[in-house]
C-alpha cells in the first residue's frame, strides 16, 4: 500500500504565530498565562501548552484581574476586547492577521453604516469575533452559510451592502454563496482580495490534486477544526473516501482492505508530529513506499508582538 502525502499540509503562518505567542509568554512572564479559547483547534497542541502553565478559559470572568490574557488565533469581538481593557488585563493578541483583515472590513462597513453579510459557520469562534466587530445600530450584520440562507435573507437597504467571509471555508461552497448574493443583491460590494486565506486555499488545492491518486484519504485534524472538516468534505465530494482523525490511534485497519494507495493530509492547526505518527501506524498496517506529492510552497511568516521577541 503506497502512502502519498499532501503538500502543503499542517501548520499555517497564523497558527505558528499563535502558538509562538503563548510559548514566548510562558518563557517571559510569571505563570499562569491565561488563553481565551483554545489558541488553535488541536488537542495535542493545547495539552502541550497546558503542561507548560497555560490556562485555557472560555470567558474573561474566569480570569483574575491584572492577569495576562492571550486571545486565540480565531479573534474576539470588540466587546471582549473592551472588557479585557476595562479590567486592566495585559493583552497579547494571537488573532491571525488574515482574520484581522476581515475584522477591519467589518469595522469599516459599520462606521459607514453599510449593512454587512458574513459568510460563515454559526457558533464558530472566528464568526463570533467577526460579527462582534459591527456596532452600528443603523445598519446590521447578517450571517449566511448556504445558498438557501441567501434566498431567505432580508436586509434594510439592498443598495448599501458588503459581504465578507470566514477565512477557513470551502472555496467552492463560498463561491456559490457569493454568486447567490450577487444575483439577489446586484449592488453588493465585497473585499478586494478574497477573505478565505492562502493556507485554506492551498490545502484544499492539495486535496484536489491528491484525491484522484488515492483510494482513501486521512485528514489529521480536530473535529472542531473548520479547515480540517472542509478538507474531508472536499475529498468526499470528489468521490474519495475520507476520514477526519485526531491522531494515529483513530486509524482503523478495516479502512484499508483492498486499498492500493492512501493519502494523508493535515489541517492548518495539526502539527507534523501527528502526521508522522499516522505514517508509522500505516506502515504497521502494510504501508510501504511514502511519497511527498508536490504542491504550492509556502514561505509566509507572521511576526509575534515586539514585547515577546
From Swiss-Prot:
Annotated EC: 1.17.7.4
Record-level GO BP terms: dimethylallyl diphosphate biosynthetic process; isopentenyl diphosphate biosynthetic process, methylerythritol 4-phosphate pathway; terpenoid biosynthetic process
UniProt-annotated binding residues for isopentenyl diphosphate: 41, 74, 124, 225-227, 269
Catalytic-site annotation from UniProt: 126
UniProt KW Cytoplasm keyword: no
Keywords (A to Z) from UniProt: 4Fe-4S, Iron, Iron-sulfur, Isoprene biosynthesis, Metal-binding, Oxidoreductase
Catalytic activity, as annotated: isopentenyl diphosphate + 2 oxidized [2Fe-2S]-[ferredoxin] + H2O = (2E)-4-hydroxy-3-methylbut-2-enyl diphosphate + 2 reduced [2Fe-2S]-[ferredoxin] + 2 H(+); dimethylallyl diphosphate + 2 oxidized [2Fe-2S]-[ferredoxin] + H2O = (2E)-4-hydroxy-3-methylbut-2-enyl diphosphate + 2 reduced [2Fe-2S]-[ferredoxin] + 2 H(+)
A GO molecular-function annotation: 4-hydroxy-3-methylbut-2-enyl diphosphate reductase activity
Pfam family, one: LYTB
Cofactor requirement: [4Fe-4S] cluster
Positions annotated to bind (2E)-4-hydroxy-3-methylbut-2-enyl diphosphate: 41, 74, 124, 167, 225-227, 269
PANTHER family documented for this protein: 4-HYDROXY-3-METHYLBUT-2-ENYL DIPHOSPHATE REDUCTASE
HAMAP family in the record: IspH
Descriptive protein name: 4-hydroxy-3-methylbut-2-enyl diphosphate reductase
Amino acid at each position: 500500500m503506497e502512502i502519498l502525502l499532501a503538500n502543503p499540509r499542517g501548520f499555517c503562518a497564523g497558527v505558528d504565530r499563535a502558538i509562538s505567542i503563548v510559548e514566548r509568554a510562558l518563557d517571559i512572564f510569571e505563570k499562569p498565562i491565561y488563553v481565551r479559547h483554545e489558541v488553535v483547534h488541536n488537542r495535542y497542541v493545547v495539552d502541550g501548552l497546558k503542561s507548560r502553565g497555560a490556562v485555557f478559559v472560555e470567558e474573561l470572568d474566569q480570569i483574575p484581574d491584572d492577569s495576562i490574557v492571550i486571545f486565540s488565533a480565531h479573534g474576539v469581538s470588540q466587546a471582549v476586547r473592551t472588557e479585557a481593557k476595562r479590567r486592566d488585563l495585559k493583552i497579547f493578541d494571537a488573532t491571525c492577521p488574515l482574520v484581522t483583515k476581515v475584522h477591519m472590513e467589518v469595522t469599516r462597513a459599520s462606521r459607514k453604516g453599510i449593512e454587512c453579510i458574513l459568510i460563515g459557520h454559526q457558533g464558530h469562534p472566528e464568526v463570533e469575533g467577526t460579527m462582534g466587530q459591527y456596532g452600528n445600530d443603523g445598519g446590521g450584520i447578517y450571517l449566511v452559510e448556504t445558498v438557501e440562507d441567501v434566498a431567505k435573507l432580508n436586509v434594510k437597504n439592498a443598495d448599501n451592502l458588503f459581504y465578507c467571509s470566514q477565512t477557513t471555508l470551502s472555496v467552492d461552497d463560498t463561491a456559490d454563496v457569493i454568486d447567490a448574493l450577487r444575483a439577489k443583491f446586484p449592488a453588493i460590494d465585497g473585499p478586494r482580495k478574497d477573505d478565505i486565506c492562502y493556507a485554506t486555499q492551498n490545502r484544499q488545492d492539495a486535496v484536489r490534486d491528491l484525491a484522484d491518486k488515492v483510494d482513501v484519504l486521512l485528514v489529521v485534524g480536530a473535529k472542531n477544526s473548520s479547515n480540517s472538516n472542509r478538507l474531508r468534505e472536499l475529498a468526499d465530494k470528489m468521490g474519495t473516501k475520507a476520514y477526519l482523525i485526531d491522531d494515529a490511534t483513530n486509524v482503523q485497519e478495516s479502512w484499508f482492505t483492498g486499498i492500493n494507495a492512501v493519502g494523508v493530509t493535515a489541517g492548518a492547526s495539526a502539527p507534523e508530529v501527528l502526521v508522522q505518527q499516522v505514517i508509522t501506524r500505516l506502515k504497521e498496517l502494510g504501508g510501504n513506499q511514502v511519497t511527498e506529492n508536490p504542491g504550492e510552497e509556502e514561505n509566509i511568516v507572521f511576526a509575534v508582538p515586539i514585547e515577546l521577541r
